[in-house]
Amino acid sequence: MGFIYDWSEERLEIQSIADDILSKFVPSHVNIFYCFGGIVLTAFIFQGASGFALTIYYRPTVVEAFSSIQLILYHVNLGWFIRSIHRWSSGCMVLVLILHISRVYLTGGFKKPRELTWISGVILAVVTVSFGVTGYSLPWDQIGYWACKIVTAVPEALDDLLPGAGKLLVLTLRGGFSVGQTTLTRLYSIHTFVLPLVTLVLLIVHFSLLRKQGISGPL
């Protein structure tokens, strides 16, 4: 082990990186309310782990989606537990995210020079809501189907500003004029690939900015 550490240290300077991370100054005014961002990240990790486990058995087809959820809940070992983690951690993530945004706003954490940190955080909030919107329809039950139909019709309101743009966006989301298999496939792809990738990139940006600028001071 010593040889591996020495070899890695010589090339990567691991110790200096660890010292920089562990020796970061934490302002004295920081309290429990500054932990909301970390809780959101923890919930996202739970979401990713439980979501990956669910993809093993979930089938993104209009015929088998609902039955695959029933399989997970009632026949797969600990399937009900994994889905419960995914479901409840999503609610926790949204709730704590609201608290996190409120704390940052009320303490002035969005002010100069932290505007970019705030902007990246707001975009992350939008992505988080998008996770909920796309994931809600994946079971493809009655609630999921009608929620999908309503949500995918919302962009049509853009036609008032840009004629034709809203309808084009609706067709893109649905993959046609009606909600069906193509819609479910696109929602599944967005939920399991596009949004996680975007989130990871934004998290790197968000934490890099936070690391560079530090925690905002008290009011």
From Swiss-Prot:
InterPro entries xrefs: Cyt_b/b6_N, Cyt_B6_PetB, Cytb/b6-like_sf, Cytochrome_b_N_euk/bac, Di-haem_cyt_TM
Location(s), subcellular: Plastid, Chloroplast thylakoid membrane
GO process terms (BP): photosynthesis; respiratory electron transport chain
Main localisation: plastid
Co-factor binding comment: Binds 2 heme b groups non-covalently with two histidine residues as axial ligands. Binds one heme group covalently by a single cysteine link with no axial amino acid ligand. This heme was named heme ci.
Keyword Lyase: no
Residues noted as binding heme b 1 in the record, renumbered to the chain: H100, H206
CDD domains: Cytochrome_b_N
Pfam families listed in its UniProt record: Cytochrome_B
Family: Belongs to the cytochrome b family. PetB subfamily.
Complex and partners: The 4 large subunits of the cytochrome b6-f complex are cytochrome b6, subunit IV (17 kDa polypeptide, PetD), cytochrome f and the Rieske protein, while the 4 small subunits are PetG, PetL, PetM and PetN. The complex functions as a dimer.
Misc remark: Heme 1 (or BH or b566) is high-potential and absorbs at about 566 nm, and heme 2 (or BL or b562) is low-potential and absorbs at about 562 nm.
Annotated protein name in UniProt: Cytochrome b6
Originating organism: Heterocapsa triquetra (Dinoflagellate)
